[in-house]
């Protein structure tokens, strides 16, 4: 359970009888936040299992308390505060909760731009909970918060909260360069795992591959879908936890996997990805993976694949090409 959730559980008296919308939930336990309140949960993260899985929430009628766990991205916080202000017709109580060392103090200036009477309500588990009265604002359009980035002769759409929002990250750039310089063979079926803004999906589709993109983020799924459409390309973009929405086998898996799970650094996601990939690859299928070079992926790749090579590297990143026997 997240520390922020544990702090919220201390607020049982304040939650009793309330109609609560949890926005951008970061913990499945938030679905059972209070037995004495009506709790509706929105999440951008597919793995939360929320009632609403979407880039931005719809505020149910009768909601009298908005609970917002602090995102890692201040752009995401700005977007959500503006969005929520545009979704309410009258001032509504809002709680912002986040780690003391995770940017909660820096987030206050964004909170105070939309909220009256900001107060520190509680502090525990290295987290702080602030409250205030969110004022109604202008109705927002998701598209207005999108950023279009140009990569070579293609375009991609990004939204606040999507990995590397508004720019091409160094790892993905190296991965694209490595694939561009390699004979990938006859285009077939490919999975872009953790598709983000869809830069890699667009590149693959432009080179004739039948693309399936997967991401846990609803914002990323929306962005990748729009990126393909913007370039006049076809592909299927899905929400899911790694390979969960995939049926059948493919010729290639391409990924720039995350090594953070919410705020915690982890290699568990990539370890699962490497272990599960052979189940979804045809014989002779290939996994392309880019990662920070200090991360311990070589042994896991060697355990799962018959041939592993470093296709490209810099002082910070390494691109692996792993072939299934």
From Swiss-Prot:
Gene Ontology MF terms in the entry: 16S rRNA (guanine(1207)-N(2))-methyltransferase activity; nucleic acid binding
Primary location: cytoplasm
Subcellular compartments: Cytoplasm
Database matches in CDD domains: AdoMet_MTases (cd02440)
Pfam families attached to this UniProt entry: MTS, MTS_N
EC number: 2.1.1.172
Signal peptide boundaries: none
Catalysed conversion reaction: guanosine(1207) in 16S rRNA + S-adenosyl-L-methionine = N(2)-methylguanosine(1207) in 16S rRNA + S-adenosyl-L-homocysteine + H(+)
Keyword line: Cytoplasm, Methyltransferase, rRNA processing, S-adenosyl-L-methionine, Transferase
One of the record's GO cellular component terms: cytoplasm
UniProt enzyme class: transferase
Family per similarity comment: Belongs to the methyltransferase superfamily. RsmC family.
Oligomeric form and interacting partners: Monomer.
Role noted for this protein: Specifically methylates the guanine in position 1207 of 16S rRNA in the 30S particle.
HAMAP family in UniProt: 16SrRNA_methyltr_C (MF_01862)
Protein name: Ribosomal RNA small subunit methyltransferase C
Lineage: Bacteria, Pseudomonadati, Pseudomonadota, Gammaproteobacteria, Oceanospirillales
Gene field: rsmC
């Amino acid at each position: 359970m997240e520390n922020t959730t544990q702090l919220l559980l201390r607020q049982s008296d304040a939650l009793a009888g309330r109609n609560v919308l949890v926005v951008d939930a970061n913990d499945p336990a938030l679905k059972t936040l209070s037995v004495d309140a009506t709790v509706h949960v929105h999440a951008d993260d597919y793995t939360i299992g929320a009632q609403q899985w979407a880039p931005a929430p719809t505020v149910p009628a009768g909601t009298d308390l908005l609970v917002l766990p602090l995102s890692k991205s201040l752009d995401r916080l700005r977007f959500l505060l503006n969005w929520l202000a545009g979704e309410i017709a009258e001032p509504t109580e809002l709680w912002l909760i986040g780690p003391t060392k995770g940017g909660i103090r820096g987030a206050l200036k964004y909170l105070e731009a939309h909220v009256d009477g900001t107060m520190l309500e509680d502090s525990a588990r290295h987290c702080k909970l602030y409250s205030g009265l969110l004022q109604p604002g202008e109705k927002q359009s998701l598209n207005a918060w999108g950023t279009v980035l140009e990569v070579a002769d293609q375009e991609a759409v990004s939204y606040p909260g999507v990995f590397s929002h508004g720019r091409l990250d160094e790892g993905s750039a190296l991965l694209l360069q490595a694939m561009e310089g390699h004979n990938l063979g006859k285009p077939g079926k490919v999975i872009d795992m953790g598709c983000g803004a869809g830069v890699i999906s667009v590149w693959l589709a432009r080179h004739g591959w039948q693309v399936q993109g997967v991401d846990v983020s609803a914002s990323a799924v929306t962005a990748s879908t729009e990126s393909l459409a913007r370039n006049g390309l076809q592909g299927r973009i899905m929400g899911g936890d790694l390979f969960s929405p995939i049926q059948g086998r493919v010729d290639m898996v391409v990924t720039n996997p995350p090594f953070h799970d919410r705020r915690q650094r982890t290699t568990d996601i990539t370890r699962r990805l490497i272990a599960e990939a052979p189940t979804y690859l045809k014989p002779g299928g290939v996994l392309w993976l880019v990662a920070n070079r200090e991360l311990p992926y070589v042994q896991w790749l060697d355990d799962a694949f018959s041939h592993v090579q470093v296709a490209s590297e810099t002082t910070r990143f390494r691109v692996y090409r792993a072939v299934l026997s």
